[in-house]
Amino acid sequence: MLGWAITFFIIAIIAAVFGFGGIAGAATGIAQFLFFVFIALLVISLIANALRGRAPKA
């Protein structure tokens, strides 16, 4: 149990360093960009599969 507590403490310290260091703002911008890129790729993939007449895999 003490091992888990130490592990989560270290993770919290690392998150605090990133959060207070200004990296979080840059990471948010990158995440938003990647989100829209992958949404566009999803739509393109769905359209391509619809034009080929294939049913989506379950």
From Swiss-Prot:
This is UPF0391 membrane protein MADE_1011595. It is a multi-pass membrane protein. Its main location: membrane. InterPro entries: DUF1328. It is found in: Cell membrane. Keywords: Cell membrane, Membrane, Transmembrane, Transmembrane helix. Belongs to the UPF0391 family. It comes from the Bacteria. The chain crosses the membrane at residues 4-24, 27-47. One of its GO terms (cellular component) is plasma membrane. The keyword Amino-acid biosynthesis does not apply. Pfam families: DUF1328. It comes from Alteromonas mediterranea (strain DSM 17117 / CIP 110805 / LMG 28347 / Deep ecotype).
